[in-house]
Amino acid sequence: RGQRDWREQVDIGAEREAMPRDPLSPAWHRLRGPNQWPAALPGMRGVILRYQAAASALAIRMLEAFAQALGQAPNVFEQIYTPEPHYLLKIIRYPGRDRTQTDQGVGAHKDSGFLTVLLQDDQPGLQVEHDGGWIDAPPVSGSFVINVGEVLELASNGYLRANVHRVITPPAGSERLSVPFFFGARLDATVPVLHLPPELAARTRGLTVDPLNPLFHDVGRNHMKSRLRSHPDVALRHHADLLDAQQLEAAQAQA
């Protein structure tokens, strides 16, 4: 934590109109708006929007499976993601060690939404925290990696845990490409705590306690928290009014 990541990425959210902003607007209004499509790649918009639609459909199928595994109706989560789920696609390139200053491709973190659908190339680098250490999650051809996010941890009262993961820099002379799709609830929604069957409720662990990454049932607040933490230099430039003293100090250190 607190180290500079070594990666290049393009963030592409849901293609929607920007929301009005005034001093009384919720901070999460800033997370919604149209994307900036490069004129040099005229076909990019259509390809990305089709991929987002397909990844959303897959994420919803996974959510229905999680819901049933938790003893709930398959559509239990619809109330907080319809009609406009919040989602984000990233296209990420991690350069090799000969072009970076540290081994940190991206630091240890959790994903803030329901779940993440991760497409990656054949270059290893993804690691998941387990029992105080790190285990590799090597690529498997023809598959996606599914990460549990903070919304599922909140809804299940910790029965499901948002997994902490990171990416280490690939070897010199190589690079790593990945395309994570983060599927979340509506920004104006509040995450309910599900009434789990007794046999599952007895095994809940409560929410993870981390002063540097508190979990909020307010979906918009939880997403904004993650964005401010993930991109402190951007936060300082465009959202300094939202930073607390600790966040402001961290952002200034990376500016």
Regions found by a protein language model. Name each.
Residues 1-3, 31, 42, 49-50, ...:
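C-terminal flanking tails of non-heme Fe-dependent oxygenases
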Residues 1-51:
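Non-heme Fe(II)-dependent double-stranded beta-helix
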